[in-house]
Curated annotation (Swiss-Prot):
The keyword Repeat applies. This is Gas vesicle protein J. Sequence repeats lie at residues 121-140, 141-161, 162-182, 183-203, 204-224, 225-245. It comes from Dolichospermum flosaquae. A minor component of the gas vesicle, might be involved in nucleating gas vesicle formation. Gas vesicles (GV) are hollow, gas filled proteinaceous nanostructures. During planktonic growth they allow positioning of the organism at a favorable depth for light or nutrient acquisition.
Length: 248
């Protein structure tokens, strides 16, 4: 009998070729169609669960995954160069923002430091001006009778009513600046000439009255004065004698 060895070899080669093509086709189909592996793995001892693992595995080609809407590797900075650029730009923007905030804080702090001395200077100026100009003191004074300097004779009486809205007096070099005051004079006797003898009744409003005092006199202070009887200076030929009565 003749051996049949060559026939067996040819059949083997045919079988291997068909098996190789079958595996390639299977892998291509799997990648083209896609395959999902899902399962749970749990390890427990004596009804006590120690480890629990859930597996969700997808095996497919890149094109098939994109068709299914899976493209997470494009946003992964370790797998995509575009994502790495975005991460670098984000870091640069954060550094710029921090530098701008630091500059803004420095500018605001410097502006606050500059405003503080200005407020202090204004307060010093106000203090100096207040020290130069004394504050007015409202003190009511009631004068019932006052006799002025006269040379002699009986002076004529002049009944007047005055409201002095502004009273300023100039003092010596040691005294302070003049201060406005309000004086109400109910009865006033003015200077008369040698020929005048009859009393005159009048009402006068004096808006600005200035009087000079001697160097040794103190500074005037704003006050409210009510004079009921006042006798002024008369001429040399007319003598006068009036008893003064002052109530302060």
């Amino acid at each position: 009998m003749l051996p049949t060895r060559p026939q067996t070899n040819s059949s083997r080669t045919i079988n291997t070729s068909t098996q190789g093509s079958t595996l390639a086709d299977i892998l291509e189909r799997v990648l083209d169609k896609g395959i999902v592996i899902a399962g749970d793995i749990s390890i427990s001892i004596a009804s006590t669960e120690l480890v629990h693992i859930r597996i969700r595995l997808l095996i497919s080609s890149v094109d098939k995954a994109k068709e299914m809407g899976i493209n997470w590797w494009e946003s992964d900075p370790y797998l995509s160069t575009k994502a790495q650029r975005l991460v670098e730009e984000n870091q640069q923007l954060q550094h710029r923002l921090e530098s701008l905030e630091a500059k803004l804080n420095s500018l605001t702090s410097s502006s606050v430091k500059e405003e503080i001395p200005l407020a202090a200077d204004v307060k010093d100026d106000l203090y100096q001006t207040s020290a130069k100009i004394p504050s007015p003191v409202d003190t009511p004074i009631e004068v019932l009778d006052f006799q002025a300097q006269s040379s002699g004779g009986t002076p004529p009486y002049v009944n007047t009513s005055m409201e002095i809205l502004d009273f300023q007096a100039q003092t010596s070099a040691e005294s302070s600046s003049p201060v406005g005051s309000t004086v109400e004079i109910l009865d006033f006797q003015a200077q008369t000439s040698e020929e005048s003898s009859s009393p005159v009744v009048s009402t006068v409003e004096i808006l600005d009255f200035q009087a000079q005092t001697s160097e040794e006199s103190s500074s005037p202070v704003g006050s409210t004065v009510e004079i009921l009887d006042f006798q002024a200076q008369t001429s040399e030929e007319i003598p006068s004698s009036v008893d003064p009565a002052i109530d302060v």
